[in-house]
């Protein structure tokens, strides 16, 4: 007999959530028909139901780490043991998977937001993801790809400079602005300075030609 909760390989998050909801609705229906044999079972499931509902609402917004969900649910004053039971259920249903969560977090934020490996590692650590899982997720980022990402950030920031610096002081101020954009994303200081200077000099040359 097929387990109605266990997802099939390749199912996306929305499909897995829908499958879990269907299984839970079926369980509730059987309870109402008297299939749940004891008052204790019904009371236990009722307590879990609200925790599960809150967890699914959070997962509807975006994928989350187990630790992140644990913290959010704990802040709502739910019983710790019930939270753990619900999180175990969701883990078995593959709706919580720190490995997949970390891989996707790194992939999206490195490509779309220009984040460095250092910042991504810190973000995942803050979400309670284990060091080994973080390291495997960060292996996706090739050092040369990270340099290309940093270069793109520097070029974008340098393009916001609308005039040629009047003097050295002006140039240094503009350079600090470009370096700051890289530093906020966690790129190494030496690389940030080199790329910022390169991007700013290219921007100044472009302004001179126009």
Curated annotation (Swiss-Prot):
Gene Ontology CC annotations of this record: cytoplasm
Swiss-Prot/TrEMBL keywords: Cytoplasm
Coiled coil location: none
Chain segments carrying region Disordered: 28-47
GO terms under biological process: regulation of DNA repair
Keyword Cytoplasm: yes
Cellular location(s): Cytoplasm
HAMAP family noted in UniProt: RecX (MF_01114)
NCBIfam families: PRK00117.4-3 (NF001059)
Physiological role: Modulates RecA activity.
Family affiliation: Belongs to the RecX family.
Protein name: Regulatory protein RecX
